[in-house]
Amino acid sequence: MFKKSSQLFSLVFFTIFSIFIGTASAIDLDEATRTVVVDSSGKTIVLTPEQVKRGKRLFNATCGACHVGGVTKTNPNVGLDPEALSLATPRRDNIAGLVDFLKNPTTYDGLESIAEVHPSIKSADIYPRMRSVTDEDLTAMAGHILLQPKIVTEKWGGGKIYY
């Protein structure tokens, strides 16, 4: 009886806690936070609240299993934090760079294709979740990746010390 009561209490507490203390929703983010770099020229765009919500949902469903908290499970040395993205070749710290990677992934130095081992549009036959992903979806997912350092700060891509 005690076990059932404690589980019920935990469930109720978690629900109430998540309602009041939950993560920032797209509507809560101001325009400055939703502003991301589009390409290597430095041009910026402001993501709509819908793009932010969609990007989070798609990232969690498609990428979240291997990139929890911006860390790469298969290679913890290369994360999705701003520094790692900016040091990649070509740079992945903008929407165009991330969309390009999601279409045709390459190694960190950009020399070899990794489409057979990393989900992408190019390897949609191997990774079914990528089959129905559109360019708008890719833009939303890239926007989510670029927004996270602004929302969760250094925790995004920070690794084991935070998660």
From Swiss-Prot:
GO terms for biological process: photosynthesis, light reaction; respiratory electron transport chain. Disulfide bonds: none annotated. The keyword Iron applies. GO terms for cellular component: chloroplast thylakoid membrane; photosystem II. Binds 1 heme c group covalently per subunit. Heme c binds at C63, C66, H67, M130. Pfam families: Cytochrom_C550. The keyword Transport applies. It comes from the Eukaryota. Its cofactor is heme c. Residues 1-26 form the signal peptide. Its main location: plastid. One of its GO terms (molecular function) is iron ion binding. It is found in: Plastid, Chloroplast thylakoid membrane. It is a peripheral membrane protein. Keywords: Chloroplast, Electron transport, Heme, Iron, Membrane, Metal-binding, Photosynthesis, Photosystem II, Plastid, Signal, Thylakoid, Transport. One of the extrinsic, lumenal subunits of photosystem II (PSII). PSII is a light-driven water plastoquinone oxidoreductase, using light energy to abstract electrons from H(2)O, generating a proton gradient subsequently used for ATP formation. The extrinsic proteins stabilize the structure of photosystem II oxygen-evolving complex (OEC), the ion environment of oxygen evolution and protect the OEC against heat-induced inactivation. Belongs to the cytochrome c family. PsbV subfamily. PSII is composed of 1 copy each of membrane proteins PsbA, PsbB, PsbC, PsbD, PsbE, PsbF, PsbH, PsbI, PsbJ, PsbK, PsbL, PsbM, PsbT, PsbY, PsbZ, Psb30/Ycf12, at least 3 peripheral proteins of the oxygen-evolving complex and a large number of cofactors. It forms dimeric complexes. This is Photosystem II extrinsic protein V.
